[in-house]
């Protein structure tokens, strides 16, 4: 019973380690020519190298199991000996192939660095374009419908996120290549500018909707305390945006913010009347 269990376990272990060797060689045979494949190649090579000692221990374990089985049975099937020799040869071959892969990674590095730099330059180009777009047209026109502006802002956000994903992806690959990449300050600045522009138009939209609801409601049915709280939030946001005005404008002024603030002041001026009648 013990011998059969040992034999079954040994067969399973031999089958598994042969599967791993086949998988590894298939990967190492495909030399990378594009950035993504190069990154995958490095990751696979690293994983294989880290697992190399474990494979050696598995090889030794199988060898020991065969030795024990031979002592228990007096002999062992020739096919098992053949499997063990095959595993030993495959392990030796793997050491050679891993060394070759290291050389391939080194040889391909300059080419891939050039390709990545080209991709990062494209990211920079889009960042400048999106920043320019954010500072013009309906994004800074106080007469535009907030719903239309917010729709376009959401589309712009999707495009910015694509560049963020690309930036992070190529930064990750550079790290795999043992290269450091400084934080993308221009992208971070663009994201802050976008967030403040989105915040402004979100509050413009909210204030207009609140004002419309208040206007349609019988004044005696209005809750002056709730309105006061809403107005305080609007006012607080305006103060925050004025402190970060450079995210909205290059000259320290933003017409959308100015009109929004004026609208808040006008409604705030009506609060004593609302409070007395509500």
State where each predicted segment sits.
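Extended alpha-helical scaffold segments
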Residues: 1-278
């Amino acid at each position: 019973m013990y011998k059969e269990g040992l034999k079954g376990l040994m067969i399973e272990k031999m089958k598994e380690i042969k599967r791993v060797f086949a998988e590894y060689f298939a990967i190492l045979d495909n030399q990378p020519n594009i950035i993504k494949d190069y990154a995958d190649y490095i990751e696979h090579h690293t994983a294989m190298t880290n697992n190399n000692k474990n494979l050696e221990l598995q090889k030794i374990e199988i060898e020991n199991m065969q030795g024990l089985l031979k002592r228990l049975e007096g002999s062992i099937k020739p096919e098992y000996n053949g499997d063990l020799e095959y595993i030993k040869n495959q392990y030796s071959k793997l050491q050679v192939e891993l060394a070759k892969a290291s050389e391939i990674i080194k040889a391909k590095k300059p080419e891939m660095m050039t390709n990545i730099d080209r991709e990062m330059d494209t990211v920079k180009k889009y960042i400048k374009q999106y920043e320019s777009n954010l500072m013009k047209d309906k994004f800074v026109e106080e007469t535009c419908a907030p719903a239309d502006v917010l729709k376009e802002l959401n589309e712009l956000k999707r495009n910015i996120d694509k560049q963020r994903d690309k930036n992070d992806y190529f930064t990750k690959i550079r790290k795999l290549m043992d290269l450091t990449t400084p934080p993308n300050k221009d992208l971070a600045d663009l994201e802050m500018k976008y967030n403040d522009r989105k915040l402004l138009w979100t509050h413009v939209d909210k204030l207009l909707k609140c004002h419309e609801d208040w206007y349609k409601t019988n004044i005696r049915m209005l809750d002056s305390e709730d309105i006061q709280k809403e107005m305080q939030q609007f006012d607080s946001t305006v103060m925050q945006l004025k402190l970060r005005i450079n995210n909205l404008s290059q000259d320290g002024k933003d017409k959308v913010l100015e009109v929004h603030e004026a609208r808040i002041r006008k409604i705030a001026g009506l609060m004593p009347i609302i409070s007395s009648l509500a």
